[in-house]
């Protein structure tokens, strides 16, 4: 049985969860169709998801179609939960990007497209909501080509449009496809193409062959020899072009009305890759070099933990894993290659949304969940001994909003910290700390909605009431200039007289480069690790009390009597030294700048632009979509608290917006 690991990605409200629910129903995994508005979807199982009608966490579903196992991950469309998308894409082999036939490419569509490009994921495009007023399939196709600089391969043309949309013409099969439900059972029927569509179908078939001939020698040869190009050859070359990411097959439908689902599932099986069709990238722990590993040849276990989820039912964390080679079973001795710890699986599950079926093993290319891990987190590599490889981890964006939190009863503070630990283990974009000045607990996240969801969880899932402060901007800081200095420590530390000198250069880097630590002097590897830990730990809080980013620390000299100093002392004093020298680098404060996409009725565009100008926003573009304008701009995050209320008031409730983090910029005032 073949495997397809796919993700479903889209901007919020493009119909992602509805499409997923239809796929689950049509493949026979569910006997009822979940509905977002009714709050009874299978993939949106969290209470907050059902109440709000949005996807918050990535739900994993396994279903079957035409002798293939399809593992689907339905990912969030809201930018506050972009980490869920990021970690899901890391383990996928293929994806479906859903576009609204009315709204086309939206802000989060661009974000997930870029994320999919980063992980080189082959994709299908599915244009949904073809029955809506303003639906324009060919405009969306044109936008995909122009915006994403890719080649969309149209596989269908619409029969009717807007409220008259009733089916599609399959260009490859040269048939009309009609979709119906009879006694709750889907019924797909085929018919000859009516006369009015014959010429248009022939035109798009020619375009399809022309595109395929750009990379297919076989099709080019058959075309030149005026020979028939068989259905099998066409589908084989579409598959090859999709997997190589040369083309993006485009389909359409109206998921809510069950139109277009079967061809979409067929295309998942026909055109998206199997885990065995692509080698995966890893780092050799023997040579410390990047290598390509063929899953057909490497039979030893290598798996990536891509999600951690707390289950209140069993009061334990469930670890979602993608197996890249070998097999997971409960008898296998495993090793966490990311931290050097030994681990063990106690139970293994096949996951169906929030329900689990216990199984004996997870094989190569498959996705499952395990219990029993004690030292693993998202992004860690699990291997069996002698398979010395490290898989590429998952990178997450920085939190941009923070908030003070305290329990109603002071006696619950320890429990609140335990809850924060649970949540931070499953959500890498959530963190908490304790203010040195006030002793307050501070939580950080990707946006107001992100923190709101977490606070709701604390109340509903953990039965703990808390008080919160107002949301605040999570600033960063960096070095303002290059500084070079030797820090000398001559004092009694841990009962010993310590004389220690460390020479350090701190250089500012460009935004987004991250922090780097280099050594220009020879030093024992154990001591080097201790110094790295000491400096890295200090990055958490700089001169202004904010996390330090985008600096290069160069250690150019160390003078000490190593035998007298323990690792922990090296770690502590290195942190002191860095903190002292960083203070002299003229530290600068950095604020997050957000990208905004505002959708407003045309008559309110002028007022919206004026409001953006008042808060110091920069307008990038204004484009028209029917009765609405789409304004793309950027503004400092601190100016955007409460912007949703301002927009509602300005547009009489008809406007909407999304925003996402763009970059950090020096805060002048």
Swiss-Prot record:
InterPro entries referenced in this protein's UniProt entry, alphabetically: EF-G-like_DII, EFG_II, EFG_III, EFG_III/V, EFG_V, EFG_V-like, G_TR_CS, P-loop_NTPase
Domain tr-type G: 1-276
Keyword annotations of the record: Cytoplasm, Elongation factor, GTP-binding, Nucleotide-binding, Protein biosynthesis
A Pfam family that the UniProt record links to this protein: EF-G_D2
Gene3D superfamilies attached to this UniProt entry: 3.30.230.10, 3.30.70.240, Elongation Factor G (Translational Gtpase), domain 3, P-loop containing nucleotide triphosphate hydrolases, Translation factors
Primary location: cytoplasm
GO terms for cellular component: cytoplasm
UniProt binding sites for GTP: 10-17, 74-78, 128-131
Biological process (GO), any one: ribosome disassembly
Domain of life: Bacteria
Keyword Nucleotide-binding listed: yes
Protein's cellular compartments: Cytoplasm
Molecular function terms from GO: GTP binding; GTPase activity; translation elongation factor activity
Assigned protein family: Belongs to the TRAFAC class translation factor GTPase superfamily. Classic translation factor GTPase family. EF-G/EF-2 subfamily.
Function comment: Catalyzes the GTP-dependent ribosomal translocation step during translation elongation. During this step, the ribosome changes from the pre-translocational (PRE) to the post-translocational (POST) state as the newly formed A-site-bound peptidyl-tRNA and P-site-bound deacylated tRNA move to the P and E sites, respectively. Catalyzes the coordinated movement of the two tRNA molecules, the mRNA and conformational changes in the ribosome.
Protein name: Elongation factor G 2
Organism the protein comes from: Borreliella afzelii (strain PKo)
Gene name of the record: fusA2
């Amino acid at each position: 049985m073949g495997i397809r690991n796919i993700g479903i990605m889209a901007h919020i409200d493009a119909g992602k969860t509805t499409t997923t629910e239809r796929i689950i129903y049509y493949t026979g995994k569910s006997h009822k169709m979940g509905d977002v508005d009714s709050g009874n979807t299978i993939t949106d199982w969290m209470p907050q998801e059902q109440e709000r009608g949005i996807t918050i966490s990535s739900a994993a579903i396994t279903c079957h179609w035409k002798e293939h196992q399809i593992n689907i991950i339905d990912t969030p469309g809201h930018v506050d939960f972009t980490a869920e998308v990021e970690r899901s894409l890391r383990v996928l082999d293929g994806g479906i990007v859903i576009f609204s036939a009315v709204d086309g490419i939206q802000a989060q569509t661009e974000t997930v497209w870029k994320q999919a490009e980063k992980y080189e994921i082959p994709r299908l495009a599915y244009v949904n909501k073809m029955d809506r007023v303003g639906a324009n399939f060919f405009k969306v196709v044109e936008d995909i080509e122009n915006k994403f600089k890719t080649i969309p391969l149209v596989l269908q043309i619409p029969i009717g449009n807007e409220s008259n949309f009733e089916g599609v013409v399959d260009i490859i099969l040269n048939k009309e496809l009609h979709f119906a439900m009879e006694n709750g059972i889907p019924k797909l029927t085929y018919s000859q193409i009516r006369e009015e569509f014959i010429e248009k179908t022939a035109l798009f078939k020619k375009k399809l062959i022309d595109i395929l001939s750009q990379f297919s020698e076989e099709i080019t040869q058959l075309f030149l020899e005026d020979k028939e190009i068989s259905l099998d050859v066409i589908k084989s070359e579409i598959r090859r072009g999709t997997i190589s990411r040369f083309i993006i097959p485009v389909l359409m439908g109206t998921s809510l009305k069950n139109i277009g689902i079967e061809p979409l599932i067929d295309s998942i099986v026909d055109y998206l890759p199997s885990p065995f069709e692509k080698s995966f990238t890893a780092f050799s722990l023997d040579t410390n070099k990047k290598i390509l590993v063929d899953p057909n040849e490497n039979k030893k276990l290598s798996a990536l933990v891509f999600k951690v989820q707390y289950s209140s039912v069993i009061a334990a964390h469930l670890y979602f894993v993608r197996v890249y080679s070998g097999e997971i079973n409960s008898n296998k001795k495993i090793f966490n290659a990311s931290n050097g710890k030994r681990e063990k699986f106690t139970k293994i599950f096949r996951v169906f949304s929030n329900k689990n079926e216990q199984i004996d093993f997870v094989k190569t290319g498959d996705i499952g969940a395990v219990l029993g891990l004690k030292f693993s987190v998202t992004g860690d590599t699990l291997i069996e001994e002698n398979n010395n490889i490290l898989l590429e981890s998952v990178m997450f964006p920085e939190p941009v909003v923070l908030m003070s939190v305290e329990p109603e009863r002071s006696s619950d503070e320890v429990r609140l910290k335990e809850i924060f630990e649970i949540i931070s283990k499953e959500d890498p974009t959530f963190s908490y700390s304790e203010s040195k000045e006030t002793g307050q607990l501070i939580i950080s996240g990707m946006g107001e909605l992100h923190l709101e969801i977490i606070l709701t969880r604390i109340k509903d899932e953990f039965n703990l009431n808390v008080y919160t402060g107002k949301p605040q901007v999570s600033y960063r800081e960096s070095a303002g200039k290059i500084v070079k200095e030797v820090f000398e420590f001559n004092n009694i530390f841990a009962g010993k007289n310590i004389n220690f000198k460390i020479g350090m250069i701190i250089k500012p880097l460009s935004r987004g480069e991250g922090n780097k630590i280099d050594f220009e002097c020879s030093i024992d590897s154990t001591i080097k690790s201790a110094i790295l830990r000491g400096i890295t730990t200090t990055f958490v809080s700089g001169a202004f009390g904010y996390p330090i980013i985008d600096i290069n620390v160069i250690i150019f000299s160390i003078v000490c009597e190593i035998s007298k100093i323990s690792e922990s002392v090296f770690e502590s004093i290195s942190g002191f030294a860095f903190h002292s020298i960083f203070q002299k680098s003229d530290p600068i404060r950095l604020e997050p700048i957000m990208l905004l996409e505002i959708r407003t009725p045309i008559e309110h565009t002028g007022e919206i632009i004026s409001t953006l100008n008042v808060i110091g926003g920069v307008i990038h573009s204004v484009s028209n979509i029917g009765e609405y304008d789409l304004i793309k701009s950027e503004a400092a995050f601190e100016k955007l608290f409460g912007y949703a209320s301002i927009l509602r008031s300005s547009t009489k409730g008809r406007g909407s917006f999304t925003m996402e983090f763009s970059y950090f910029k020096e805060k002048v005032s």
